[in-house]
């Protein structure tokens, strides 16, 4: 044995200064003395022995399942077989290490699959850069490889570290790299674009201000900035990795360290406060058992998560946070465009019913649940956090801004501020056929909880006019008029806007023309039969009485004529009076009294409607009641039969006191539909079930209250 090699064999410090080829030569010499070889190699480090073993086999393996003694025996066996030439290389690779039989994934094409150190080259290493280079016997530098045995990537001359396996901040690599503790600059969405591909330790990123994850750094997004190129990259994947490991781990030290990392990552983001609250709760629960989290992997006596009192609860919170994070990753952008109000066929036809259900104008978005109702050409109603979807308990008030979509900035002053529970506001002064963007900011005290933006398109002026005319047609008066005089030629006229008042013939010409008038009147009489009146009573949405102005016009026009048109309201009279049991033939003085009574009733109705309008926006009292009853039927709290009877009674027979009681019930139980339905059924079931008798003859019918005839007129 050479003297220099003999001295190195006994001194481990000299051995560390030797090159790989010199170490291999020394091992070959030691293999000839089997009693001395094992003792000398035992003084060497495990990494030095593995380096020689990989060079001898031509393969890079970690041999984590073998002890140091077993590795030395394997190395000496391979060297002895090479010296004796007893077996071939292929057989040696397959037989010498039976434990390492697992197939490994192929490396990428742009990197060398295996690196074999040539016997004629001298390898020099550079510990600072983490790379090594091979120099041939002529002194010419050839190829530079990464010092990491698990990487061995080819490096360029200008590279100071391996971008594939080393940190771009500390320029070091991990022997057993954990990808969940590294951040990589990539082109993955939502931050697409050219990336450098460098990676760094997560701990190094926390200690560097350029990464945006410093102690005092806060950002609205969930990103970090590459220290090398400055590109923004998403942190969502890193969050999910930490939470997944924390949810599945069995070791307490791993759970503590991962939760510490998640909490540190979330503190740098102002956008995901809800997720941060869940993680903070998990950390507080865990700290009650293990103490404050220092951030470094720790060894604990009770190292199993299931042995901790709070272990299962903490991992459940991790699962909850992970589900919230998955929802965030799959949520579309915040700004969502509402469907245009013109797209609904119901709104194009403007076929509104008395219930005024505008489901097509309603849309929700975001956590605040913004809804638009009564979208017109110049105004609309904004509704936040409806009764079906109440607002979160920590929300105190909302501030609303609006602008046209082409405009970039919102006005400095907010459009309105809504405080819980009042979450409805009418916005007027809008331009027809214009798209507006509404921004709603929710607050908990002075703290901003969230921002939602939503677009809406107002109607055009033509659509607004068409809708107005359609609404007028839908509520056009359907008269039910009849005369109770002894004149047999008197007829009952019924139409939307016109009426027929036949006169007694005063001349021959009038006698000749009277049959044509009677024929036309007879045709119109066919429209109103007893069955029609019963059908009208069953479906209250298809019957509307004459309003006060039209009744005044009818009475003024018929004052000078013998037959008098009597409206349903004047026919029935005062609902509370027993004198209204029978129809009365009106005289001049009676008409004046009826006119005054109608004015008083109109004023009362306006007052009632005003009360409802205050609670229900632009809805009248009857419309508001019909809408509520219809909602109770759709939700299954009442049946169709009760709905028909109740609305017929409410619109035709209910007294002012009963209407007031119904209004109080609706306003009181509006948040509890089931209780409202039970109260209405219990209070008014008997009243709505009372049938009204129809009297009259020769095709003319009138609906009057049942009972004894107390007075008689002639």
Swiss-Prot record:
Description of the deletion phenotype: Delayed flowering in short days but not in long days conditions, associated with high expression of MAF5, a floral repressor, due to a reduced H3K9me2 status of MAF5 locus.
Stored PROSITE patterns: FN3
Superkingdom of this protein's organism: Eukaryota
Tagged with keyword Phosphoprotein: no
Annotated stretches, region: Disordered: 478-530
Gene3D superfamilies: Immunoglobulins
Induction of expression: By cold (e.g. 4 degrees Celsius). Levels follow a diurnal regulation with an accumulation during the dark period and reduced levels upon exposure to light (at protein level).
Biased composition (Polar residues): 478-498
Zinc finger motifs (PHD-type), residue ranges: 164-232
Position of sequence motif Nuclear localization signal: 239-246
Gene Ontology CC annotation, any one: plasmodesma
Fibronectin type-III domain boundaries: 366-463
Main location group: nucleus
Chain segments carrying region VIN3-Interacting Domain (VID): 602-714
InterPro entries (alphabetical): FN3_dom, FN3_sf, Ig-like_fold, Oberon-like_PHD, VIN3-like, VIN3-like_C
GO biological process assignments: circadian regulation of gene expression; constitutive heterochromatin formation; flower development; regulation of short-day photoperiodism, flowering; response to cold; vegetative to reproductive phase transition of meristem; vernalization response
The keyword DNA-binding appears for this protein: yes
Any one GO molecular function term: DNA binding
Protein localization: Nucleus
Cystine crosslinks: none
Function: Maybe involved in both the vernalization and photoperiod pathways by regulating gene expression. Binds preferentially to dimethylated histone H3 'Lys-9' (H3K9me2). Promotes flowering in non-inductive photoperiods (e.g. short days) through the maintenance of the epigenetically repressed state of MAF5 via H3K9me2 and plant homeodomain / polycomb repressive complex 2 (PHD-PRC2)-dependent H3K27me3.
PANTHER family (UniProt xref): VIN3-LIKE PROTEIN 2, VIN3-LIKE PROTEIN 2-RELATED
Complex formation: Self-interacts. Interacts with VIN3 and VIL1. Component of the plant homeodomain / polycomb repressive complex 2 (PHD-PRC2) large complex during prolonged cold, composed of core PRC2 components (VRN2, EZA1, FIE and MSI1), and three related PHD finger proteins (VIL1, VIL2 and VIN3) that mediates histone H3 trimethylation on 'Lys-27' (H3K27me3).
Annotated protein name in UniProt: VIN3-like protein 2
Organism of origin: Arabidopsis thaliana (Mouse-ear cress)
Lineage: Eukaryota, Viridiplantae, Streptophyta, Embryophyta, Tracheophyta
